[in-house]
Amino acid sequence: MSPGRAARAEPIPCVITAMADEFGGEIPVGPFAIIGDDSIGRGIVETLRGSRSRAVLMRNHGPFTIGRDAKDAVKAAVMVEEVARTVHISRQLGEPLPIPQADVDRLYDRYQNVYGR
């Protein structure tokens, strides 16, 4: 589901609490880049700089994720596909309702700093 959003240069809006917990907001879209040099890497870094998201949809490519280690990056990749699917399904019923940023901030802080500790 996420490559379709990358093809449209459409970020994944933060519409479920699990997404607020894991990504701290929407999953952004990075620029188009030609494979073969460091353009994709630079685009990923520039897009995620200043963002809490561990995922980016690179325009016309698809999702890229980062993490503390490989397992964490794979967890983020699985979550990207799950939330992309959720948004796609919810759009069949109408426009999904984004979580207000103040609530996203509270959810992210609780999950990252309190939950499970």
Q: What does each model-identified segment do?
A:
Residues 1-117:
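Glycine-rich flexible loops
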